[in-house]
Amino acid sequence: MASTADFLLDDQTDEDFFDKLVDDSYTPTASSSAKELKFDDGSDSDDAKAFANLSVVDDVLGDGDVALNEAGLGNDVANEGTSGSVGKEEPSSSIAPEAVQFVNSDANRLRDVDVVRSEVDDMALTETGKESNIVDGSGSPGVKEVDWGSFYADSSVNDGGGFGSYSDFFTELDATAGNVQGQAEVAVATGGNLVANDTINTSVGLDNSAGFEQHQGQVQHDSGSGQYVDNSQSWENLYPGWKYDASTGQWYQVDGQDATVNSQESYINSTGNWESVAADNSDVAYLKQSTTSAMAGTAESVSTWNQVSQVGNGYPEHMVFDAQYPGWYYDTIAQEWRSLDSYNQASQTTVTGQAHDQQVQNGHARTTTYHNNSQSSVYDVNNKNQTFKAQDFAIQGQHGSWDESYYANNQQAGNTWQPVNVGKAEPAVTSDSLSRFGGNQQVNNLYSTESVAEQFKPNTIGAQSFIPQHMNVASATQNGPLSFSNDLYNRQQSVDHAQKSFQNNQLFSPSVGRSSDRRPPHALVSFGFGGKLIVMKDNNGSLQNTSFGSQGIGGSSITVLNLAEVISGSASYSSPGEDSLSYFRCLHQQSLPGPLVGGNVGSKELHKWIDERLLHCESSNMDFSRGKLLKMLLSLLRISCQYYGKLRSPFGSDASQKETDTPEAAVAKLFAFAKKDGIQNGYAPISQCLQHLPPESQMQVTASEVQNLLASGRKMEALQCAQEGHLWGPALVIAAQLGDQFYVDTVKQMALRQLIPGSPLRTLCLLVAGQPAEVCPTGSSSSMLDNWEENLGIITANRTTDDDLVIIHLGDSMWKERGEIIAAHICYLIADKNFDPYSESARLCLVGADHWKCPRTYASPDAIQRTELYEYSKTLGNSQYILLPFQPYKIIYAHMLAEVGKLSTAQKYCQAVIRCLKTSRSSEVEMWKQFASSLEERIRSHQEGGNLAPAKLVGKLLNSLWGMPPPAPHSTTGNPQVNEYQHQQQEAAKLSYSQSANTMSSLMPPASIEPVHEWGGNGRTMAAHSRSVSEPDFSRTPIQDQTDSSKDKAPDGVTQVKSTRKVPSSRFSRFGIGILKNTVGKVFPSRSSNEAKLGNENQFYYDDNLKRWVERGVEPPAEEAALPPPPTSVPFRSNSLGHENKSEIKNEMSPSSGSWSSGSPTPSENSPGIPPVSQGSNQFSARGRMGVRARYVDTYNQGSSSMYQSPPVQSSKPPIPAKAKFFVPAAPASFANDQVMESVSAETRQENSGDEAVVGSAGAPGPSQASFQSPTPSPIAMQRFPSVDNIRRSGSGTSLNGDLPQSVSRRTASWSGSVNSSSFMSPTSASTFRPSPLNSSSSSLGEELQEVEL
């Protein structure tokens, strides 16, 4: 040869063959002058270049000689021209001489084929075994002629297939060549990259067979016109989106290039040659197709000829046989060798459906198009030449890009071939079934995608990934599995086992039943309360052949699954991600034995849980650094539990205590152990502490100088000399003698000049010197952060002043600069940093949770558990400790527990939260209570069976008998407790003695603490308010008094209630005087004997000397000291119940407890129920709630929420005499007009002109400087209405309008039969101020206790 190229081949068999070829194993003697071929290991692309550069030189033999022209390296296609002759002769057959032509083509044009043919028509064929020397200029042979049988000589080298496994093909070609008339021109069209995978076999010399490979070439008959594929186009097909410029040799990217279009065009050119085939003149072309993309991850690179020769053996393509292992086959799907006997036994009992509509004969498929009556002739490997007619067929649901045609290679049909007597346990799916994914896939080249869909394996669900069987397969993307098993309950069987009753190979077509946006149907999944997972499956759609339903069953099915079982690693479900597993693991498997606060948790159980979590931190699936920090954090929380919530002793505690008994010693040991463990593992180097020290000789000189200075008594100079010479020991001694300031300064100088920045010793020295700002200077804290464990340990073990600020700063630096949230929280816990509600400035919300980086997901179960452990450790030292910002996270944790099905634990958490928030009084706390109560009620209802709960059934029964209950009290804000609390504050501000009222309000339990459960309409309990002054008397018929103060008549006569709320009337009133009422009357006997009996004559009279009311026959008590004057800062409030100002009455007098209405409540609303507790009562009236009936008027209750009511100043409507049994409290209202205020002001001035005294009721002390004033007389009978009469004391300030002084009202009681218009008279002068005698002859009210205001 003129020149030799370096062939880079990977196949060991090819290399051995050519080594023998060079060693004259197959050559004559003249071959010794030929240059040896060198073979190096290289890539496939280098192999292709070497083969492309091979050409014949045409300057040796003239017109009839063979010329090898060496193509340029820049050409993308080798220029091949031949004028030599090769031949093959066997005794068994007479073969006419045939000219072998090598078509010469380059990247720019295709040469005329006829011209090349004319040059080689006269070539003669040599005999077998002879050589046709194609020599160069020196006459040395360049090309060797080898018998075709030599390629198959060494069968043991190539697994029984010989070199390249081409011998069988050409032997059969030679056997059938005698029947071919005319000349057969062998055209080699080398398009694009000849070598595309590791299994390609390339021959050199006259055997320019272009590397025939089953997935890269096809045997086709070329028409007489001679159609050839442009090689540059093949290169462009190989790299979609790029275009090759032959003139410049550069690649250019093409926008919008579609690989599918290139594949389609190339396919049309290659398949169009099959339509018109001439029987007498046929060209055998080895068309090398270009591969667009190779699918990665092949099972194994095997010899391709072995598989081609097994096409007609009746076995699937994923079964690879090897002659060296008879009776065994390699399963490319299972990736293992299996016995052929086991497959035959399984295939005899398995009947599978045929997935094709096209008959495959002898293992070969034919390419079928829509052209009728077209014939294709394919050379069979079994030495047969078959001619068969293409069959017409319809394409259903085809929307692909293959020009409405199927394609296959020489081995595999356009669809799955399946002999009737052979069954497959795992069906193969090829290009036919892929093409039925209309619109859902993209086939990037012309080869059949021999991908196999695995059946369901044990412990898996859903379609497994498609495993390609060979290297050179198309890159196809499909949206769903191709073949499924209908087995839902037979997952425990082996994949190799024949599933007779459940096997179904019917293909799944997602194009059927799709939605408008081309989405396939799927099952609906929803979460249910209590850890349930609900799955609804539609059996009517295209899912009926999948594993989600059984074939032939219509309708839908709903399945309720237990979420805990699904997540716990059931064999029927695929495992979710690690994050999901950690979430459910914390809730279900590693949940706290809580609630810790308010629960009954033993110390052993708690320590066991901590040990399990510490062991989990050391597991392999957790990051090492994070696991190390979590382990340290949990150990710190355990120390906190051991020392009752303390991680450090208070500053200045007893130093004589043993170091081992303190919590800071335990914390220091923890950090020391972590540092030691890090040094042993090699990730924490030993830190250096000291800087460079002066030499020893210099130290000796400095010491002598300091000694001389001290001997002369110059301490300051000696101290300065010792500091400059780094003689810190004597310097500290001298500084201690000079004073604390010198000592602190010397320690600071030593830390800054001798110790390395960031070292723990330097940190401690600066803290001792009282310089915390120097510990972490700005911009140089990285060295301290590197040793943050040691620094934190030394600060913790040695308490100094303001060291907590340094620890907090260290945590902030770790969080902001290093992003170590766990390390930062360790610092915050040691510094005893308070927990804060969620905000941008909060440092500590949950232990170990980054609420800055993950504001929506930081409330994880493990973070809540760690925070609860810290709260529990605090309660061990202080049982009254409440971590208030943590309570809402407990409610969130209870919801998490309810989601996974742990309802009982979630209910306990709700109850614990309600108990913790029992004493809190704020708006957010009330909201948390509502959330916890709502979840608890929902859990209780769920546990009782939902709507079939016994409580609800009984409630419905009572409602059907008695009717619906009255509507619930209406609240303007929807929160009775909040309204009650706010009302207490408002009423306390209105009182002159607000201190006593506030004291009593703090002692009063709210309405929610003492609930009275009643049957509600829905079976739930309604909370009634606390017991009032006295208990209701069910044995007596209540007096229904009618008043018009709270009701107005509409024009149509309908009564309109003006009150904002009503008192729920007793349900027993619905029965009248029924049997049930009489029974209750016997249970609760009448208390009429306890009522006061008024006599015919009043026992009290007004004493002019004492200026007060006294009782006849009773010696008056001694004069008491005058009370101190009232506070002057309390504003004056003058109120009256004017009906023209009803809006103010509603705003100021509406109590928030929901038990009585604004304005004057009607007796019909108050008499049957329980009167409410006065919100502004003090400790002297507390006995009314204890069941003791008050005999005298409560003069210590001030303000609108008094137990008793006083008559109004004036009334706009004539009231009706009231006959109620109890005194109903009411709130004060402002005066209606200025005339009444002026009248009261005038009376107050008259009262203050004389001596002022107070006559109180017997047994109750009365103030001596208080004055009385008479109410404005009313022309009608008195009615109980609220009134606050303000009487100025001495020393009081000015009032609202400037001329009415501030005063204090006092009320007393009088025993009388009735009160008429002449009961009280306005005073005429200050000296004659006294009430007129009460009229005892009137009997309008009978023997009722009336409230009289003096």
Swiss-Prot record:
Its main location: Golgi. The modification Phosphoserine is found at S43. Residues 1150-1168, 1317-1343 have a biased composition (Low complexity). Belongs to the SEC16 family. Required for efficient protein export from the endoplasmic reticulum (ER) to the Golgi by regulating COPII coat dynamics at the ER. Functions as a scaffold and regulator of COPII coat assembly at ER exit sites. Interacts with SEC13A, SEC13B and SEC31A. This is Protein transport protein SEC16A homolog. The lineage of its organism: Eukaryota, Viridiplantae, Streptophyta, Embryophyta, Tracheophyta.
